[in-house]
Amino acid sequence: MLDKIKHIILVLSGKGGVGKSTVSTQLALTLAESGHKVGLLDIDLCGPSVPFLLGLEGHDVHQCEQGWVPVFSGADQRLAVMSIGFLLKNRDEAVIWRGPKKTAMIKQFLEDVAWDELDYLVIDTPPGTSDEHITVMECLKGVNADGAIIVTTPQEMALEDVRKEVTFCKKTGIAILGIVENMSGFVCPNCAECTKIFSSGGGVALAELAQVPHLGTLPIDPRVGALAGTGKACVTELPDCTTSLVLKSIAKSIGAE
């Protein structure tokens, strides 16, 4: 099912709560707004947030001869989405599975979803380096995945976990497309001034240390946060904000025009 996909991008984070799913979702929307056919696969089995972020909660998936049919976001149906969140009754339902069952589900997501022809598939992964990540890497061995984007925050604790993520990528042979530093500063909703409320520059320093590109720095912007649950792209709703400019730059770095 992956052989018809031109580009496969993984989005990783060493720690939870760094905004990885938001970056994944907005990157997928940015690519779709650029005219590309895009798939977004959420394999965070225990904490699927993509359906909520795109305003797709309550949608059901069904099967065809080729496998599961993804849920489409937007009237133009340029963004196809698959998540375990579509298979759960509600957001409060917990996924309490052992490793083998998680592995089997991820393999199904990667092998049995009828994506059809896509320009890009963005894979939103769970935090850390667990069985789920190893399964993804094994399933992608037969295809030419572009590589991984690693999301971090400026705090030292998050950066420590990202160092492990960098090591994981190198050991499993997945290329690192770059590092994104998220939640670096707070944008005032009244005057748009960005104040450094945490430390900053950690993502840049880590990228230099790991000898990989630094793809950009994203602030905490309440206007961007308000888009959660709407399915709207930041690049169209807030075209001049820092987040939009960084997203466009990332899209360009992975070949999107």
From Swiss-Prot:
Note on how the cofactor is bound = Binds 4 [4Fe-4S] clusters per heterotetramer. Contains two stable clusters in the N-termini of NUBP1 and two labile, bridging clusters between subunits of the NUBP1-NUBP2 heterotetramer.
Q: Which PANTHER family match?
A: CYTOSOLIC FE-S CLUSTER ASSEMBLY FACTOR NUBP2, NUCLEOTIDE-BINDING PROTEIN NBP35 YEAST -RELATED
Q: Where in the cell is it found?
A: Cytoplasm
Q: Which UniProt keywords apply?
A: 4Fe-4S, ATP-binding, Cytoplasm, Iron, Iron-sulfur, Metal-binding, Nucleotide-binding
The uppermost taxa in this organism's lineage are: Eukaryota, Metazoa, Ecdysozoa, Arthropoda, Hexapoda
Q: Which GO terms fall under biological process for this protein? A: iron-sulfur cluster assembly
Which family does the record assign?
Belongs to the Mrp/NBP35 ATP-binding proteins family. NUBP2/CFD1 subfamily.
Descriptive protein name: Cytosolic Fe-S cluster assembly factor NUBP2 homolog
Question: Does the keyword section mention GTP-binding?
Answer: no
Q: Give a single Pfam family match.
A: ParA
**Any single Gene Ontology cellular-component annotation:** cytosol
Annotated source species: Culex quinquefasciatus
InterPro entries under this entry? Mrp-like_CS, Mrp/NBP35_ATP-bd, NUBP2/Cfd1_eukaryotes, P-loop_NTPase, YlxH/NBP35
Q: Which SUPFAM superfamilies match?
A: P-loop containing nucleoside triphosphate hydrolases (SSF52540)
Its biological purpose is as follows:
Component of the cytosolic iron-sulfur (Fe/S) protein assembly (CIA) machinery. Required for maturation of extramitochondrial Fe-S proteins. The NUBP1-NUBP2 heterotetramer forms a Fe-S scaffold complex, mediating the de novo assembly of an Fe-S cluster and its transfer to target apoproteins.
Cofactor(s) annotated in UniProt:
[4Fe-4S] cluster
One MF term in GO for this entry? ATP binding
Q: What is its main location?
A: cytoplasm
